[in-house]
């Protein structure tokens, strides 16, 4: 059953870091930058026809929130990004 975004952030797992690593190059291309620091911190998720992951990522420039869509039998793809976030900023739907 599909639904809203999970209410509370979950600490990033190795699986979430792997998803984050998969879209790193997509994000770097989109923003025209290269990251030496790219660490998933926490995330929320939303079940759709696949899974949306809303991931807080620590980067060289602070924190970004990225939205990644992964089809049930597909490859994760970057959907959007919110830059200039802080560690304290809540992860919300975007």
UniProtKB/Swiss-Prot annotation:
Keywords: Cytoplasm, Protease inhibitor, Thiol protease inhibitor
Short motif Secondary area of contact, span: 46-50
The keyword Cytoplasm appears for this protein: yes
GO biological process: hyperosmotic response; regulation of protein metabolic process
Protein name as it appears in the record: Cystatin-A3
Keyword hit for Cytoplasm: yes
Site description Reactive site, residues in chain: 3
Gene3D superfamilies named in the record: 3.10.450.10
Similarity section: Belongs to the cystatin family.
Localization (cell): Cytoplasm
Described purpose of this protein according to its UniProt entry: Intracellular thiol proteinase inhibitor.
